[in-house]
């Protein structure tokens, strides 16, 4: 039997719930390995659980891969030589393979109930919870006839080889071995003939000629069973080979517990909605088990492709750290070309933060440049730029910032600033002119420290202690709004002179 020389990996999630970062990390590592080796990534959907699967979740998985720009070479939406790529559409294929395994004797009918299995264990002095005891392997024709007469319908179990030590080289964990005596014959199809995951997953891998199975370590215990099934599939002409396995480490949450779907950090779309960009997300997910080098955490996707090898993935559990994700995301935001950043920021703010679509493009581009190096996530920009789209009358001052910056001495600062800015011609209200006018009076003549001189002005025009650069912010607001806000702040200070 000829072997497939090209690396072929797969990503095969079940469409349940929202995309989990651990699931996406698995997709990423498969994608990176395929790209690194010049191989192919197959994307299929395992949707045979009618009670849990949903079309909404199916679409969410596709959306998550597209948002992250993780393309695939074969499978859902793009097609390929092994269609269809949804398990629910492949039932005839599984039925045909099951018949071949029945004919070869690799699977057999098992009629024992759980209660009967436990009773036999108990009678033999064994733990009743040991699992199936392989009792039905050698049923006589008379016994089978009796069970049928009772109306029993059998499940179908794979006959595990006797006296076998299962050995394989795991790409992540090294050489592994399991005594086959600890692995009982297992069910591959229900009594109604419906195939189980234990059958359909390896069958799909075999027919799609998957060479490397990279998956979560929660599936590690099933490897001996799958090896035995692959070997049976080779015997009946369905599979060409047993694939190479690599079991990726768990993604952990707080308290060294596995990151569950209940944890907000596990939801990929939460991160997207909170302003994480694809480059930052992928860079961080890559670090959950892999690294470019000991002292290099920031890298591009091309660097990942050039350097990724599954053999370099560490087997130890990786903890999800939200702060580190945001720090890495900040680096990738700064790495974006300004035009690209501006376009992404505008799209994000309009979709998620209600930023007005009619805000002037030239002003937005100016504002985007001011915040690109000051934010960790796109959502941070909303807080920094919100004052630009708030009317003068609706601007509210942060109480803490106002209390700190709008004290008695702020009245004079505000009055001087108003006078200086009023003197600037309307057409000359630009950053450099504003800076010169305020600096000459507040810093050079009054000898105020910049924090004392500009703190009150910043709070007055933005409502907050932190904003984009002050003079640029004034230019963006324009002369009329800037003066209106300075006057309003002067009236709101506790020590403002009484109006006559």
Swiss-Prot record:
Origin: domain of life: Bacteria
Annotated residues for binding of ATP: 261
GO biological process per UniProt: glutamyl-tRNA aminoacylation
Main location: cytoplasm
GO CC terms of this entry: cytosol
Catalytic function, reaction form: tRNA(Glu) + L-glutamate + ATP = L-glutamyl-tRNA(Glu) + AMP + diphosphate
Molecular function terms, GO-annotated: ATP binding; glutamate-tRNA ligase activity; tRNA binding; zinc ion binding
Sorted UniProt keywords: Aminoacyl-tRNA synthetase, ATP-binding, Cytoplasm, Ligase, Nucleotide-binding, Protein biosynthesis
Listed Pfam families: Anticodon_2 (PF19269), tRNA-synt_1c (PF00749)
Motif ('HIGH' region): 13-23
EC numbers for this chain: 6.1.1.17
Subunit structure: Monomer.
Family, as annotated: Belongs to the class-I aminoacyl-tRNA synthetase family. Glutamate--tRNA ligase type 1 subfamily.
Known function: Catalyzes the attachment of glutamate to tRNA(Glu) in a two-step reaction: glutamate is first activated by ATP to form Glu-AMP and then transferred to the acceptor end of tRNA(Glu).
Cross-referenced PANTHER family: GLUTAMATE--TRNA LIGASE, GLUTAMATE--TRNA LIGASE, MITOCHONDRIAL-RELATED
Protein name: Glutamate--tRNA ligase
Gene name, Swiss-Prot/TrEMBL: gltX
